Swiss-Prot record:
Name of this protein: Dynein axonemal intermediate chain 4
Primary location group: cytoplasm
Gene giving rise to this polypeptide: Dnai4
Disordered as annotated region, ranges: 1-44, 300-320
One GO-annotated biological process of the protein: hematopoietic progenitor cell differentiation
Protein's organism: Mus musculus
Stored SMART domains: WD40
Function: Plays a critical role in the assembly of axonemal dynein complex, thereby playing a role in ciliary motility.
Keyword annotations of the record: Cell projection, Cilium, Cytoplasm, Cytoskeleton, Flagellum, Repeat, WD repeat
Listed Polar residues bias regions: 1-11, 22-31
Compartments (UniProt record): Cytoplasm, Cytoskeleton, Flagellum axoneme; Cytoplasm, Cytoskeleton, Cilium axoneme; Dynein axonemal particle
Length: 807
């Protein structure tokens, strides 16, 4: 291959400075396209480490340069014409879009014109651009071309610039930039649905303020060291006093910088008060003691053995001063003794006992007529005071004159008394109020339960507590005595309402109390302390609902019936009937768990079949119970469903019988004391029913009012008299006289509700509790009496023969 003219000119122009090494020439088959006018010269990125002498086509005209086709091939020939063109190390993608040539290796100072491109020096970096892919564009942009360094040994013309190499170079740099700035691949749906585990770890604790404690527990590990250290310090302080080993000296310490802080508080109200004491006030205050002392001194001086004239005035003055001192000491001593004695007297038990008896005597004097009527005794009349003899003589003369008149008056009085007696015999039965057990502590509380003491008929236990859950207040149980109706003998206050009370039979000093929170407590009334002897507050088997009734029951231990033991039975709203045995605390066992029952019986004609209601709880809340008076193994239980179940202590899984009749909660069930097969019940459905234990339906039903009946009670003296407490009145029924209307009706005051009734044991009196905290005592007057022989047969006559009851 022949050498181009360019090579000839290149050899001729650089002949003087050429070296002995062989020359290389570059031939362009396709000249460069349009590189003129650009102010930079491009270097071949495929050549490394050395600079070669290149010639520029400076003789070509701009017009000829414009005619050079764009495609070109670069060949490097040595002096012998051998092609030594180096192969490119980087092969760009032909399909990749060529970006605009960026001036990566150009000077940052500006661009050169075409007139100054003919000769300048290019300092090429000895680094392959393909190796710069790891660096950023700032590194690539740091290469620059100096306009001022023009070399004659190595020059290049813009016309000889290889455009293909330039394009390759720009593409390579573009690829490098694209690889660095490529965005992350899009996340697919499968990757989004994958579960990613994120582990949260605790960061380091940042302490903004740490105040070390100066107190340590005696049970801590450091307690022994601290105690030993404190002892050493104490011994050091003791040995320091008077010891020559210790010297006091001054030392400067750093005090903490004070900090002012503002705190918001309530307004401080200031008040000014002044007291003025005049000289006359002071004189009057001290004048009275001085006059008393002067009077006493005069008394002492009058008892002297020597007259005042014979004595020395100095001796008199000394004696008077000594006497004053002695008197002051004696008076002070007397006052101290009086104060000490007064405190001891007020706190003595003997004084309290004397005051207790004195109070009872005064109450009996005040309530003597009422107490006599309660005990059915004659009323004591006070004696008239005796008159002097003169007045008696005058009166005797008058009496002698008025005797005929008095006889006539006595006859008239006798006739009036007979008329009154006949009128009283025709007066119907009624209630006369005697007194009421009430005080300031019971004012406004609801009377929930009444119970007589079995050993002392004059002692009454009263429970105070509301029935409703939202009406709960503080409760109280009191023991009242008939000898003092104004104040209770014992007071047991609690945070919960009292729902039931009952005295023990074998131990009359024990009082059982049931509370609204499910606690059962036992108090000893012989003790003045208000702390219960036993309670179930911490028992794991305590009731979960209000304890509506508690009662002491004597049960047979053996088959003979002589050996009996007493247990405490309670019924609660949680559906449990439990017995409590006093051994080591309160030992609880369930007699029965009341379960809800579904209604039985076919539907009547024209009645639609009712759908079964979903049961919220399987347990039926219990409201009351009553043990059989003859067989204590059998008892009745009234529920909130309106059913009465007959149960046995030997079977705790099923009922012996179920009595249906009430439509509301059964509040009270009680056996007839003279006819043990008949019992009485009252309910919130306004009704009172009489049942026979062999028949599941009631024999008699009483609906006199449209009010709730809270309590019923049989009379202890008659088999057919009972009392019922409605909301607004108390009714006394006599089944022998009428089964339609009550015998006596006593209406309550406005705003007051009757809650409990209880007959007195030994008298014809009735106790009625109300919602205002009063227990009124009424005397039953003109009540009909039944013959003793027919007591147990009247109920059977009213209900029919027993053979007809079965079935």
């Amino acid at each position: 291959m022949h050498s181009s003219p360019t090579s000839t000119r290149k050899q001729a122009s650089f002949a003087a400075s050429a070296s002995a090494q062989p020359r290389k020439s570059i031939s362009f088959i396709n000249p460069s396209k349009s590189s003129a006018g650009k102010g930079y010269a491009a270097s071949n990125p495929n050549k490394l480490a050395v600079s070669r002498t290149m010639g520029f086509l400076t003789d070509m005209k701009p017009a000829e340069k414009l005619n050079v086709p764009s495609a070109k091939t670069v060949q490097v020939l040595d002096s012998k014409g051998v092609d030594v063109t180096p192969r490119p190390l980087y092969h760009p993608d032909p399909h990749a879009a060529s970006a605009k040539p960026n001036k990566l290796l150009t000077s940052q100072e500006g661009s050169l014109g075409s007139d100054y491109i003919s000769s300048y020096s290019l300092y090429q970096n000895t680094l392959n651009p393909s190796m710069l892919g790891q660096y950023t564009r700032s590194v690539l942009g740091s290469s620059s071309v100096s306009k001022s360094s023009i070399s004659t040994t190595e020059s290049m013309s813009e016309d000889l610039e290889d455009s293909s190499y330039k394009r390759d170079r720009l593409a390579s740099f573009t690829d490098v930039r694209v690889l660095r700035s490529t965005a992350e691949a899009a996340i697919s749906k499968e990757e989004l649905e994958k579960t990613i585990e994120i582990i949260l770890t605790e960061t380091e604790t940042l302490r903004f303020f740490d105040l070390p404690t100066v107190m340590f527990s005696t049970e801590s590990e450091e307690a022994e060291k601290i105690i030993e250290k404190n002892k050493k310090y104490e011994t050091l302080c003791r040995n320091r006093l008077g010891n020559d080993l210790y010297v006091e000296r001054m030392m400067q310490t750093f005090n903490g910088a004070p900090k002012n802080k503002e705190v918001q508080c309530e307004k401080i109200i200031l008040e000014e008060k002044g007291v003025v004491a005049t000289t006359w006030d002071l004189y009057d205050s001290y004048n009275i003691p001085e006059t008393l002392l002067a009077a006493k001194r005069s008394g002492y001086s009058s008892k002297g053995s020597l007259p005042a004239k014979d004595r020395d005035p100095k001796i008199q003055d000394s004696e008077s001063s000594s006497l004053m001192d002695i008197e002051n000491v004696i008076l002070a001593k007397v006052q101290e003794d009086e104060e000490d004695n007064s405190e001891a007297i007020l706190k003595s038990d003997k004084l309290h006992q004397d005051l207790f008896y004195m109070e009872r005597v005064l109450m009996e004097n005040v309530f003597q007529p009422k107490l006599a009527a309660y005990r059915q005794l004659p009323v004591y009349k006070e004696h008239e005071p005796e008159e002097p003899e003169e007045t008696l003589q005058v009166e005797n003369l008058k009496v002698a004159e008025d005797e005929p008149k008095k006889e006539d008056e006595e006859e008239v009085e006798m006739e009036l008394e007979l008329e009154i007696a006949t009128e009283q015999s025709t007066i119907p039965a009624n209630l006369e109020r005697l007194w009421s057990f009430s005080c300031d502590l019971t004012k406004g509380l609801n009377v929930s339960s009444l119970s007589w003491n079995k050993a002392n008929p004059d002692l009454l236990a009263v429970g105070y507590g509301n029935f409703g859950f939202r009406e709960q207040k503080k409760g109280m149980a009191c023991c009242w005595s008939i000898k003092n109706p104004m104040w209770p003998e014992r007071i047991y206050q609690s945070s919960y309402g009292v729902t039931s009370v009952d005295f023990s039979n074998s131990s009359p000093n024990l009082l059982a109390v049931g509370y609204h929170n499910g606690t059962v407590a036992i108090y000893n009334v012989q003790s003045s302390h208000n702390i219960p002897v036993l309670d179930s507050s911490e028992s794991p088997q305590k009731h979960l609902g209000p304890v509506w009734q508690v009662q002491w029951i004597e049960q047979d231990r053996g088959t003979t019936g002589d050996d009996k033991r007493e247990i405490l039975v309670s019924i609660s709203a949680d559906g449990r009937i439990s017995k409590w045995i006093i051994r080591k605390g309160l030992d609880c066992h369930d007699l029965m768990r009341l379960k809800r029952t579904t209604a039985t019986g076919g539907k009547k004609g024209g009645e639609k079949e009712k759908k079964g209601e979903a049961l919220i709880s399987r347990q039926a809340p219990g409201m009351c119970f009553a043990f059989h008076p003859k067989d204590t193994n059998i008892y009745l239980a009234g529920t909130e469903e309106g059913l009465i179940h007959k149960c046995s202590c030997s079977y705790n899984e099923q009922y012996l019988e179920t009595y249906r009749g009430h439509k509301g909660p059964v509040y009270k069930v009680t056996w007839n004391p003279f006819c043990p097969d008949v019992f009485l019940s009252c309910s919130a459905d306004w009704g009172v029913m009489i049942w026979h234990q062999d028949t599941v339906k009631p024999f008699l039903s009483f609906y006199p009012t449209t009010y709730v009946v809270y309590d019923v009670s049989w009379s202890p003296k008659s088999a057919y008299i009972f009392a019922a407490a409605n909301e607004n009145r108390v009714e006394i029924w006599d089944l022998q006289i009428s089964t339609l209307d009550p015998l006596i009706v006593n209406v309550a005051n406005p705003g007051i509700k009757f809650t409990t009734v209880l007959f007195a044991k030994e008298t014809d009196c009735l106790l009625v509790g109300d919602s205002d905290g009063q227990v009124a005592v009424y005397e039953l007057r003109n009540m009909p009496t039944a013959s003793d022989t027919s007591r147990g047969d009247v109920i059977n006559i009213l209900l029919g023969p027993k053979t007809n009851h079965t079935g």
